[in-house]
Amino acid sequence: STLMRSSAASDVYKRQTQARREEIINACAQLYETMGFKDVTIKEIGKITSFTRTSIYNYFQTKEEIFLALIGREFDLWSDALEQALAEEQTLDRARLAEILADTLSARTLMLKILSMNMFEIEENSSVEQLTAFKRTFGRSFACVDALLAKAAPELDAAARRAFAYSFFPFMYGIYPYTAVTEKQRAAMDAIGFGYSVYTVRTLIQQTAQLLLAGTTPEK
């Protein structure tokens, strides 16, 4: 029937749109591995996609919206891993939760890099519609961490769990620079005799999560 043909055509269009969005996001991620944020432009992205730069504007209005979709995808992957841990961990305590946070986030260094380096600019230059979609994705991760904490420390009430989240999530914005020290930064710190330590992403997260979890107690 005409209705069925129309529905099938709509499904094909949706799949094609999603595939093209993914291709653009993948190209952005590929460029960001070797280029600075300011050098990743829609023109550069267009050079490594199968369609023209002009066509990119059918899917994203600014390069910041592409980055927003990229970090949104990263947050979704993190949430997937957290939900899997929630389903698989029969017994969970605070020490194991710190390990889970460290393991799952150390697999998402791209997300941590964008969070610490460019997030304000990305949000500022994205539409309210795109930003709303991202905040929904971010909220899912927030809820996953809350659910894991509720399972690991059932004695904590919602206010105490929220206090942990409002310490841990801001910390995430600062992880990357402490784990990716450039030669220039290293030389400057050596010049002033600054005794610094370079941590792996996993070690820094596990250590900080353990400290925050140890200090999280039920609200009076």
Regions found by a protein language model. Give the residues of each.
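Single conserved hydrophobic/aromatic residue that forms the stacking wall/gate
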Residues: 1-9, 13
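Amphipathic alpha-helical segments used for helix-helix packing
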Residues: 107-132, 183-188
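Hydrophobic alpha-helical connector segments
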Residues: 69, 83-111, 164-168
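C-terminal peripheral helix-coil segments that are non-catalytic and often amphipathic
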Residues: 140-155, 174-220
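Helix-turn-helix
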Residues: 23, 31, 35-65, 69
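Alpha-helical structural segments
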Residues: 19, 23-30, 48, 65-85, ...
